[in-house]
Amino acid sequence: MTNDRFGLRWGLAGGTTLASIDEARASARFAEAAGFDSFWISHATGVDPIVTLACLGSDFPGISEVGTSVVPLYGRHPVGLAQLARTAQNAVGGRLTLGVGTASKRHVEGALGLSWDKPFSYAREFIEALE
């Protein structure tokens, strides 16, 4: 017996973004029918991945894990992100994995107008606040 697990990631690295919750639902339905163990949504310019996964709720019992890959920390507050993740975790029956990261200097400074000073320290402090 093997412990291999396979997931489907949809979003930025997949070459597209999810434009709607219905599109995410169709993608998750495909993942479940194809036998994938997990379903992941990237944070990009489409729908919010955490809200979308919460909306999918328990529609797909054959998928053992749903997750974000990756939610950028800059531009969010730890309390708000923790509350959002906790709500989604409840909606999906404890199957959520929250993937987070700093994004890129170009995005943080250019799109958000924030300082890219010490991004790893920023991420560490943010994650500690989430806990």
Please place each PLM-identified region on the residue numbering.
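N-terminal beta1-alpha1-beta2 module of alpha/beta enzyme domains
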Residues: 1-68
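Flexible, glycine-rich active-site loops centered on histidine and acidic residues
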Residues: 4-19, 75-131
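Conserved strand-turn element in the central/C-terminal portion of the radical SAM core barrel
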Residues: 69-73
